[in-house]
Amino acid sequence: GISEANIRLVGSHAGVEIGEDGPSQMALEDLAAIRAVHGSIVLYPADASCTARLVGQMADTDGIVYLRTTRGAYPVIYSLAETFPIGGSKVHRGGPHDQVALVGAGVTLHECLAAADELARLGISARVIDAYSVKPIDRQTLIEACRVTGSRLVVAEDHYPEGGLGSAVLEALASASVPALRVAHLAVQGLPTSGKPAELLEAAGISSRHIVAAARHLCLVR
């Protein structure tokens, strides 16, 4: 930022995933707000191991760094031995014949992984990208996913559509030499209500079921 301040921020209980607390507590525009700050870094881990690693890096990183965490207890995906460089990502189930890429971060990574399992049962090969570094985003991994899948991407985020993960993905690919983009951007639309986390993810259209439907539709488009 202009002041060249070194500020580390952690935002918890964000997104419809928080459940019963309701929309006044969901902070569905936090990623957009911090992404807009010049030179900022925005991180969104999906499990405890990734969170621990990124917190350590925050302490050693100058500038304005924001880390968004989730409220619920989610399965641990990564070992503590894994590294999570700022500006990186993790690819799950990637292969040379993938038909679609599912991009998520935080809670929606778990939904993307569940969706990939269901798509595999339907005969559709899907890679999953954990975009834990929302800013800077891993542009090269996105470009490679486009090259393999014919630019079929489903981006799912627990955030309003403006300025969050979907915007970061599209901005990264806007000037890239990739096939014509076929992107399904699943994000929270309108004002959520109060309920169980799974109910609210489903109502917002960002659950694994919606990700599967979006991916299947993209795979029908030639």
Map each language-model feature to its residues.
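Conserved thiamine diphosphate
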Residues: G1-A101, H110
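Thiamine diphosphate
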Residues: I18-G19, R68-R222
